Amino acid sequence: MGKFVDLGVSVFDAEFTLNPYDYLKEIYDRKEVLGFHSDGMNFMFRFEQSRAVIFSKNCTRAMGNNEELQQLEEGYAKRYPNRAWHFRNSYTHGEPDLKFKAAIGRFVAQVADQASFFGAEPIFAKLSQGGTLDNYIDEISTLPMRVFLETCKLPYDNHDLEVLHTSGCAFLKSLENFYDEELIAGCDSGLACIRDYMESQFYNLDAESPLRPLISAGYNCGMNDEQLIANIGGMFLTSISNTVGISSAFILRSLLRDQAAWRTLQEQPELVENEDVIMELLRRDNHVKALSRQFDQSMEIDGFKINSGEVVCLYFPGINMDHNHWKKPTTIDFSRTFTGENNIIFGGSFYTCIGRKLTMAFLSNMIDGFLRHLPATAEIVDEEIEVDGSWMAERMITRMPIHLG
C-alpha cells in the first residue's frame, strides 16, 4: 500500500488525541505521503482523499472481511450472547425497513421538539459559582441521556442513568477494537444492561411516550418485540451520551480556548440555533476518532495504489483540520457552511448516530447553557485534561478542570 509515515507517537497517546494537528500539520503538504502509520494500522487523514474513500461503493466499513475474522466472530457469537442478540435484531447491522426508518425520523423530530433542558439549569449554573470545577465532564456526560429518558417518559434513578451511560460507552469502546476480547466482553455486559432496562419499560410505557408511535410503526412493518427493543436500545441508549455528551466536552474546551468565538456567541445567542454554527464547533473538535474501511477492489488515490482486501482507517480529527481544505483550520469560523462536499465530518452528510435533528437540538441547548453561565475569567489548562486514549472509534475526555476565577 502507498507510503504511510511513522509519526513517532501512538494514535492512542493522550497528547495526540487532544492535539493531533500539532503532529499532522507538517505532513499535509507532503505529496509522497498518503497517510500515517501507528500501532500496526494505516491511517488516511486528508480531506479529499478520505472523501473519495467514504463515497466509494467499493470501500466497506469493516476491520477486514476475511476467514480469520469470520471465525473470530463465530466464537464471539457463542461466548457473548447479548452482543449476538443485539446484532441479530438491530437493523443498524443489516438492511433497514424504509418505513421503519421513516418512523425513526418522525420519532427523532418529536423528541427534538419536546425535549426540555429546564431541569438541567442547576448543572449549567455551576459554571457561575467561581473557584474550580475539578471535573465538570462528570456533570455533562449523562445530561443528554437524562433529558432523552425524561422526554420519552422513561422512569430512571441515578443508578439507571449511570448504568445506561457506562453500558453505552462499553458498546462504543468495542467498535473498531475487534481483536480485543476484553472489550467485546464489556460490550456484551453493557448490551445486557441496556436490554434489561428496555425490556422492563417496553410493556409499561406511559400513554404519552413518543416511543409508542415508533413501536406501532414497527409492528406495522412486521417487526417483533425483540427487534424493537434492540433497535431502540441500540440506536439511542448506546449513542446519545457520546454523540452529545462527549462532543459537548470538546465544544466547551474549544470555546474556552477561542475567546473570539465565545464572545461572538454570547453577543449573538441566536447563533447557537444555527446548524452550520454547531457543525463548525463539531468540525473543530468532536468525539469521532477513526473508522476503518476495507477495499473490496483495488483503488488508486493520487498515484497511490491500494490493493483489494486491504484496510485503512480514516482519521477524522485530521480530515476536519486539513489546511488544504479548511482555511485556518484551528480557528472557529462561523461563516463556514457544511452543505455539498463539506458534509463528512462524522463520515457523511450531517450524519450522527442519533439523527441530525436530535443532535442539533440537544447540542444547541448544551451550548446555550454553557454560554449563559461561563464567566469571562474561565479557563482550562491542557496539561490538566485527561483522556481515555484506548478507544479506537471515539475520543473521550475523562477529566477537564475548569478554572472559573
Name each model feature, range by range.
Residues M1-G405:
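Cytochrome P450
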